[in-house]
Amino acid sequence: MKNKRMLKIGMCVGILGLSVTSLEAFTGGALQVEAKEKTGQVKHKNQATHKEFSQLEKKFDARLGVYAIDTGTNQTISYRHNERFAFASTYKALAAGVLLQQNSIDTLNEVIKFTKEDLVDYSPVTEKHVDTGMKLGEIAEAAVRSSDNTAGNILFHKIGGPKGYEKALRQIGDRVTMSDRFETELNEAIPGDIRDTSTAKAIASNLKAFTVGNALPAEKRKILTEWMKGNATGDKLIRAGVPTDWIVGDKSGAGSYGTRNDIAIVWPPNRAPIIIAILSSKDEKEATYDNQLIAEAPEVIVKSLK
């Protein structure tokens, strides 16, 4: 069948007075032009998004790191995606992923006891359960949904501390994230200090691995994403910057030097999910962070991924 088709092509070329060689040259040239056009379109789109992200930095007097992955098309949107930022409380979603990776679902029913001395600043859930303790699953949920800092420290302890967390990320391909301290010291975010830092690209890649990749089986992925969908601290962040009919599961973070972050898995209707990491910082230690910056950045992403 293939030989007959080649014969027909040869006859057609002969009739038109074109050699097979010239036909190949013509089609090859057309393909090259098409490839150049597509490359140019992508480059133009990247330049446009870079300009918009740069304008947001000027508007809010902040440094911005962005990485988004359309898991259906593998298209990415990025800006300062390889620059380091303090990850702040965004680690809690990924640490919960590590916890699920290293333990059976039954382990989530284990009751963990802790004392008043274990409590650190901003522990709205754990502070109510000093006398009774909490199930490990409840602690993980408190860390992700309420950003409870004592719960975050307990997660760290259950996975081998900050360095255990870092090691677990290395095993899924992250060669960037540095994890060194517990809550609340990890939120210092001193410029130039690489402790407790990562990049938007590394964090987004980790979140993708735990929520849609192979780092967790489907049943555990569902547990993690349900915790993230119930996040009580992200309404003014990525969730505010995407269409209202998109489902968002996120984990926010905040620290000194105007650090404000949000990472999310976002489900547009009838489309594969999008993974988004948005990190930000400012120059002054006591600078106030801007939720609106984290809300406006995803508007650029949504427009670019259409």
From Swiss-Prot:
SUPFAM superfamilies: beta-lactamase/transpeptidase-like. The keyword Signal applies. Pfam families: Beta-lactamase2. Its EC number is 3.5.2.6. Keywords: Antibiotic resistance, Hydrolase, Signal. Residues 1-43 form the signal peptide. It catalyses: a beta-lactam + H2O = a substituted beta-amino acid. GO terms for biological process: beta-lactam antibiotic catabolic process; response to antibiotic. Substrate binds at K251, S252, G253. InterPro entries: Beta-lactam/transpept-like, Beta-lactam_cat, Beta-lactam_class-A, Beta-lactam_class-A_AS. The class A beta-lactamase family has a specific amino-acid numbering system, sometimes called Ambler or ABL numbering and often misspelt as Amber. A multiple sequence alignment was used to derive a consensus sequence and then the consensus was numbered taking into account insertions and deletions. This allows use of identical numbers, e.g. for active site residues, despite differences in protein length. UniProt always uses natural numbering of residues, hence there appear to be differences in numbering between this entry and some papers. This protein is a beta-lactamase with a substrate specificity for penicillins. Belongs to the class-A beta-lactamase family. NCBIfam families: bla1, bla_class_A, classA_firm. This is Beta-lactamase 1. It comes from Bacillus mycoides. The lineage of its organism: Bacteria, Bacillati, Bacillota, Bacilli, Bacillales.
